[in-house]
């Protein structure tokens, strides 16, 4: 592994921990994603965070996801994450389930394997964190 790859891996580990330390399951391989989606209960809701190393993920996407997932009255059954740019195959497989234009960071909310709500990067970047939290809250309130 070259120094750049090592640096990015170490950086990503900290960014991944922001979610996993708050109850998100990290799916790091294509098989992890496929197995999860094949075995999810059709009545369960799953909140997916497509993580990223960009500034809007650090300052907006991860903090908003954690805050709403912890504090909202209605919560998804499951919380998972894949890391764009780091876990490329896992991210690609998740995007096949999402079936939207690739976007990171982004959020997806599923009921079973059916996509119920998607929030792309363009609805995260440059916005106020409270507005992002309200978007997530509204999706949870409607679908969880």
From Swiss-Prot:
It comes from the Bacteria. It holds the Pfam family Disulph_isomer. GO terms for biological process: cell redox homeostasis. Transmembrane segments: none annotated. Belongs to the bacilliredoxin family. This is Bacilliredoxin SH1478. It comes from Staphylococcus haemolyticus (strain JCSC1435). The lineage of its organism: Bacteria, Bacillati, Bacillota, Bacilli, Bacillales.
